[in-house]
Design a protein with these regions (language model features):
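Conserved, structured C-terminal
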Residues: 2-37, 42-43, 118-327
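Acidic, proline/glycine-enriched N-terminal capping motif
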Residues: 2-103, 108-110, 240
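Well-ordered mid-protein domain cores that form the structural environment of catalytic cofactors
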Residues: 88-142
Length: 327
């Protein structure tokens, strides 16, 4: 069979980074834009250190519109998702979310994600930007009859508002009588003649929310966030601070700490795997790992003093240490 090479046109299309609904706002705010996971994203506005400290001490806002957003709908959606994801979807009531994994047949991590139950048989999956296309294809290939899987990524934007003053900014945006969702919960909240979805989640180690809205409302919402957050010391924050914040908390990064060659038990994240479930993709491989012990273990460490980046180190016998994401 003749090998079909991709055309020049397809290569150009694939290589061109996409822009989030907030791209013009980023350039207006003076952000330094870089390609990331197929998107043009702000890496910083002022300095990574300033943005990092703003989130730790006050509040910051990040564009997370590049992340994939999928809707799973239909009778049997709960049972189907429980067979595709490692955590127990049965534990979710409407309005609740949980961290979980999408695995291949060998138990390797395709992606880590958050699944929200937004109605009785309707779910929102928020996945990593760099894995979104692969995730969608994998789920599509395993789809059961009666289940609808759609991507709303092109029609929606999202921001993460993170920091100890998130609660104050939430009420400044939505009203003092509107209740902030509980941790790992999601709710629709009125905003300027429309509704936005507010989830009490984040990737920084601080209190925070992630807000999902129609792409057409993106600029208006970010403007409101920055204006009403000004008395609270808010700063727009880029990917640089997002990375240092998650690294400081030892949160894993897909593509570095997590990969299809490493399973959740080896990644030290077995807490988000429910082996009591009778079946899910990758379960058999995880049971074997549990019984025999992991071939490797991802563990956090902190440098005691300044020094060169850690390198692979053979400690004893066949054991060898490999730093996954040095700071």
């Amino acid at each position: 069979m003749r090998k079909i090479e991709p055309s020049l046109v397809s290569i150009v299309i694939e290589a061109a980074p996409r822009k989030t609904p907030l791209y013009d706002e980023h350039t207006r705010l003076g952000a330094k834009m870089v390609p990331f996971a197929g998107w043009l994203m702000p890496v910083q506005y002022t300095s990574i250190v300033e943005e990092h400290q703003s989130v730790r001490n006050n509040v910051g806002v990040f564009d997370i519109s590049h992340m994939g957003q999928f809707i799973v709908d239909g009778a049997g959606a709960q049972a189907w998702l429980n067979g595709m994801l490692t955590n127990n979807v049965d534990k979710l009531n409407a309005g609740m979310g949980q961290y979980t994994f999408l695995l291949n047949d060998r138990g390797g991590i395709i992606d880590d994600l958050i699944v929200y139950r937004i109605e009785e048989q309707k779910y929102l999956l928020v996945v990593n930007a760099g894995r979104a296309d692969e995730d969608f294809a994998w789920l599509q290939n395993h789809l059961s009859d009666g289940i609808s899987l759609t991507s709303r990524s092109a029609d929606f934007g999202a921001v993460a508002i993170q920091g100890p003053r998130t609660n104050e900014l939430f009420h400044a945006l939505f009203g003092k009588d509107v209740e902030l969702p509980a941790r790992n919960h999601i709710a629709d909240v009125p905003f300027d003649a429309t509704n936005v979805s507010v989830a009490r989640t984040g990737y920084t180690g601080e209190d925070g929310i992630e807000v999902f809205f129609y792409a057409k409302d993106a600029a208006k919402f970010l403007t409101a966030v920055l204006e009403r957050g000004k008395p609270l010391g808010i700063k727009p924050c880029g990917l640089g601070a997002r990375d240092t914040l998650r690294l400081e908390m030892c949160y894993p990064l897909n593509g570095s700490d997590l990969s299809p060659e490493r399973n959740p038990i080896e990644a030290g994240l077995g807490f988000f795997v429910d082996l009591a479930k009778p079946d899910f993709v990758g379960r058999d491989a995880l049971v074997k790992t549990k019984e025999s012990g992991p071939r490797e273990k991802l563990v956090p460490f902190r440098m005691k003093a300044k020094g060169p980046p850690p390198r692979p180190h053979k400690q004893s016998g066949n054991q060898q240490d490999h730093p996954a994401a040095p700071a």
